[in-house]
Amino acid sequence: MPRVEVGLVIHSRMHARAPVDVWRSVRSLPDFWRLLQVRVASQFGDGLFQAGLAGALLFNPDRAADPMAIAGAFAVLFLPYSLLGPFAGALMDRWDRRWVLVGANTGRLALIAGVGTILAVGAGDVPLLVGALVANGLARFVASGLSAALPHVVPREQVVTMNSVAIASGAVSAFLGANFMLLPRWLLGSGDEGASAIVFLVAIPVSIALLWSLRFGPRVLGPDDTERAIHGSAVYAVVTGLLHGARTVVQLPTVAAGLSGLAAHRMVVGINSLLILLLVRHVTARAVGGLGTALLFFAATGLGAFLANVLTPTAIRRWGRYATANGALAAAATIQVAAAGLLVPVMVVCGFLLGVAGQVVKLCADSAMQMDVDDALRGHVFAVQDALFWVSYILSITVAAALIPEHGHAPVFVLFGSAIYLAGLVVHTIVGRRGQPVIGR
């Protein structure tokens, strides 16, 4: 018995020291530490920008609120993540990623000023959405560059852990940015003037991200000039980005399996997002209250994703990427059924649990791309992931918006989401089985 007690004490101390050990590992990698700081500043700005626009577009009585209008707003806000992904990947695999970060953040500052001005003068939805479209496109370049650069600043054996640290830090920053939006909205109102002030505030974290991007040396973030790199003109590299990325995905079953599971999760996220937005608009008379309830749901989902960032590295080491992702997809299919009653408190809890499961699937896919793909093509593959990530999301929202009633009471769509998870599990199981064992799997 004493031997067991001593073992338990040692085991507990090891777990207690784990965060300290991770922190020391982060600080021992100076370039990763700098990259992490850029991510934190950039994603705080992203969260603030997206929440400010959501308040202006979706919780403003002077603007559209029906399901198709909500779907259209989401499509415009996130279209850059799907359309520009292949081009971002091609440029990142050809240009110094430091200058991609610098250039994209500089462009973001200009667009932030433009969008803030559009809101300040009370212009219509079209110029506002066009400005948001371009601003989000530039934000996509930054996010893709940060992900593709990570293996350059982290030893291979630490990629999974440090990727989780990076994603967790970014998620927390985006969450804080989105919730910080509530303060100026409360002080200045929920109209266009308040939204304009929020957008102008985004310039602060983006400026910090820009300045911190300048601290890297030439080619520190990649890409490598390997023999597999795509040569020729820059135009050729941009145009062929998606083709090369897709071909690489097809050739690597571990990557293809991960992306299939991720696509299934994103389709369900789209359905659930539309349902919760319609439900809170229907049951809450005040737009501010509706926005707060919606933010609570998305915050719970983000908190679940944060927890997954902590748990996933251990799960992958114990069971491998393949089994871990399969388990997460199976759990998600079960959790989704519990939300069929469309009770908002229950949906918030399910959102938290689905945030855990979905982020586990994404991290498994990320580790496959970061460890199984040559650096010269990694940016292209991440671009394919970005495109799939957002196309599946936008398509599911659009299809659901055409069928879901305005009050949002459509439990059959919740059950359909569970079926999508099961389909993703089947595809992941079949495709992933073809993959050859690799280090870290």
Curated annotation (Swiss-Prot):
Cellular compartments per GO CC: plasma membrane
Topology within the bilayer: Multi-pass membrane protein
Main localisation: membrane
UniProt subcellular location: Cell membrane
One Pfam family named in its UniProt record: MFS_1
Transmembrane segments: 68-88, 110-130, 131-151, 164-184, 194-214, 229-246, 260-280, 287-307, 337-357, 384-404, 412-432
Domain of life: Bacteria
MF terms in GO: transmembrane transporter activity
Keyword terms of this UniProt record: Cell membrane, Membrane, Transmembrane, Transmembrane helix, Transport
Family according to the record: Belongs to the major facilitator superfamily.
Protein name: Uncharacterized MFS-type transporter MT0042
